[in-house]
Amino acid sequence: MEISQAEWVRDTFIDHRYAQGYFLMGAGDRLEWYTSRQRALIPLDERFRYPASLRRVLNQNRFQVAINRDFSAVVEGCADRPMTWITPRLKEVYHLLYATGWAVSFETWQGDELAGGILGIVIGGAFIGESMFYRIPNGSKVAMVKLVEHLRQRGFLLFDAQLQNPHLERFGAYVVSPRKYRQLLAQAIRKPCQFL
């Protein structure tokens, strides 16, 4: 019995990998699944914070927010750096996940210019952040704040940032053990949430 592309994608990438706490990275021509000993999460409660300088930018309303307005440009923006794990093969996977309703881009714009964005996978009430980028200063930071607002409004339970770094710490990102992460992920993916 043949299965549809959507069923194959769900079985191959979602149910047996992302929903189990793994994430993809490209390594040359190969795609490899990873997990981490300490999983970074962006808080969706009062622990979320951002610098005062960003508050001024937000108050100026310099950026407009869009979802999936230019998914391909966000993938390219995330991959456009000297050392990238978003290989051509992984780009194909992201486009396949987008075509089947799992991958999304949360974007900031200035007029007709893409300012920044966040690439993610949505499963139930979990948003798994894959990468982010900016072309205009503060573009990705504003995207982060607006994405957290969006996830809160939609009742999401989890914003997974995968790996901790100093940039994410400025937004209140914290780490949890693999066991705690799997518990939070299992709870989140069971909650039916609409991202769009």
Swiss-Prot record:
It is an enzyme of class 2 (transferase). Pfam families: Leu_Phe_trans. It is found in: Cytoplasm. It catalyses: N-terminal L-lysyl-[protein] + L-leucyl-tRNA(Leu) = N-terminal L-leucyl-L-lysyl-[protein] + tRNA(Leu) + H(+); N-terminal L-arginyl-[protein] + L-leucyl-tRNA(Leu) = N-terminal L-leucyl-L-arginyl-[protein] + tRNA(Leu) + H(+); L-phenylalanyl-tRNA(Phe) + an N-terminal L-alpha-aminoacyl-[protein] = an N-terminal L-phenylalanyl-L-alpha-aminoacyl-[protein] + tRNA(Phe). InterPro entries: Acyl_CoA_acyltransferase, Leu/Phe-tRNA_Trfase, Leu/Phe-tRNA_Trfase_C. Coiled coil: none annotated. GO terms for molecular function: leucyl-tRNA--protein transferase activity. Keywords: Acyltransferase, Cytoplasm, Transferase. Its EC number is 2.3.2.6. GO terms for biological process: protein catabolic process. GO terms for cellular component: cytoplasm. NCBIfam families: aat. Functions in the N-end rule pathway of protein degradation where it conjugates Leu, Phe and, less efficiently, Met from aminoacyl-tRNAs to the N-termini of proteins containing an N-terminal arginine or lysine. Belongs to the L/F-transferase family. This is Leucyl/phenylalanyl-tRNA--protein transferase. The lineage of its organism: Bacteria, Bacillati, Cyanobacteriota, Cyanophyceae, Acaryochloridales.
